[in-house]
A protein has these predicted regions:
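Amphipathic alpha-helical dimerization/coiled-coil segments
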Residues: 2-9, 16-21, 39, 95-114
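N-terminal helix-turn-helix DNA-binding core of bacterial DNA-binding proteins
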Residues: 15-62, 73-75, 84-91
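Charged, amphipathic alpha-helical coiled-coil/dimerization segments
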Residues: 68-113
Length: 114
């Protein structure tokens, strides 16, 4: 079960003090490397090193900060023997990305045709 983040620990939601869940989620997902980490964990658990490699050598400090954010939000968990993986909630979130991924593929093909 995801931990509830105390109001004092939450980072400000960009441009809003509403505290609405959608704004908090968009703020979390808008942080550097958050979406990429979720995407790279879509098929399997990865160690910190493998995840860093998959994320184009992201800074270890930033990567660990994002992993901490995503763990605290309940999207990622650390399994000692295998590394980081998506939780069930993280997999649910990933499912919401798939239509956008399919659209991005169509958009890419449409905009590269000459």
């Amino acid at each position: 079960m995801p931990k509830r983040i105390p109001a004092a620990k939450k980072r400000a939601v960009r441009g809003s003090t509403s505290g609405r869940p959608i704004m908090a989620l968009l703020d979390l997902l808008g942080r550097r490397w958050s979406l990429r980490i979720i995407w790279e964990l879509r098929d399997q658990a990865l160690s910190s090193r493998a995840l860093r490699t998959a994320c184009d050598e992201a800074s270890p400090t930033v990567l660990q900060a994002r992993l901490s954010d995503l763990r605290e939000a309940g999207f990622v968990e650390l399994i000692p023997a295998s590394g980081y993986r998506l939780t069930e909630l993280g997999k649910d979130l990933l499912e919401t990305f798939l239509p956008l991924h399919r659209f991005a593929e169509r958009w890419s093909k449409a905009t590269t045709k000459n």
